[in-house]
Amino acid sequence: IFPNHAAQAARDRRTRVWTGDVWKLHRCLREVRPDLFLLPLDTRPTGLLLIAGLDPGNRVLWDRYNPVVKNFRDRDSEVPPDAVIAREGAVDPGSALVTKVLEELRDLKARGPAPREVVGALRALSRGRE
């Protein structure tokens, strides 16, 4: 989700390490699915996005797919903003926060709560980060 330079973010592959326009996914999910917990991780070569709180019954993206894709293609340039290249807001995967989030996910899985409860618990752990 984090291209290292604009060439890696091109829709057509021109580099060995390539992300295409997947860098738009984080912003898209933040806007279209605010019910999810999103934690961008600063991993090499192109980062990861931890997504939690998924509900298999949620049809928001399915129902709005074409308008969402058109919106992000039309309004976002093909060149990622400097903040994306700089990985602003990304968390070191070895940080205590990531460890806590993964432990909480393990514990939550054992209890089987609803997706909104999962998101609430993870957001409480990461206050000030989202």
What are the residue ranges of the model-derived segments?
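S-adenosylmethionine/decaboxylated-SAM
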Residues: 1-129
